Amino acid sequence: VKKYLLLPSLLLIFLFIQPAANAAVKKRYSPCKISYPSDALVEWDCYRLKRNETLEKLFGDRWQDVARFNRIDRRHAWPGMTLKVPRQLDDIKDFTPLPAVLPAAEQDEKFILVNLTEQFLGAYEQGRLVFSFPIATGDSKFVTPTGEFRVTAFSRNHVSSLYKIEKTRIPYPMHYALRFFISRKEVAFWIHGRDLPGYPASHGCVGLYDEEMQKKYYRNPDEPELMAARTLYEWAIGTTPDDGGLTRLKEGPRVLIIGESPI
């Protein structure tokens, strides 16, 4: 009799274990659920995306401004999520929450500022902002280190040695990667291309738009336009020879990381 009772007992154990495993899945957030100090500078409302709606369909040639303001890429603008939509789109034209002038970088030919609180990165030349992009960094669990660093290596075709693309065995692509820190546990931290879901979602690295990568691995979007990772990478390494692999950089740009994750 005990032999036949064993199977139902095992089944019950399995059913109770399953929810615990599912609970470990990383939580997703809509951009409307994330607060930034610069939100107060713009009047906006939450808008829930409907089926078949896209950033391009809703905002025409201003879709990139809305994407920047929400720190999101096109692939992650899903039906059901809520976006921050400015009442006046002109209020977010070329949106950036970063200072146009950074006195601490006046003596630097190239300088990178990462603001975790705002989830934005800026590139400076002699203390003047030349371009900026939204980012996805680590959250309170996978913390992005703060402080002063320097880009010491680069790798155009870099891939993760720890993480895979979801539901595949393909190493997660970290293209246009700039290494700025190696921890005492020998964990390397990079600025690189990745998905931008609209909230901090990395394992500690600093992620930038890379629609080239998304088209290659996810076949979406059809026409890549957001290529912040490539822009920063090419600016940072300048004329240094690049064979696509890991290359050390003797005097790379200084990197200053400030603030804390909004989640």
Regions found by a protein language model. Give the residues of each.
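Exported/periplasmic cell-wall-interacting domains
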Residues: 24-26, 75, 162-263
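Loop/turn positions that initiate beta-strands
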Residues: 79-83, 252
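Intrinsically disordered, low-complexity Ser/Thr-rich linker and spacer segments
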Residues: 32-39, 85-109
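Bacterial N-terminal signal peptides
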Residues: 8-16
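Bacterial N-terminal signal peptides that target proteins for export
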Residues: 1-8
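Primarily a LysM-type cell-wall glycan-binding module
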Residues: 30-62
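LysM (lysin motif) carbohydrate-binding repeats in extracellular/periplasmic proteins that recognize
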Residues: 50-77, 131-132, 219
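Gly/Pro-biased beta-strand-loop elements
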Residues: 95-199, 253, 261-263
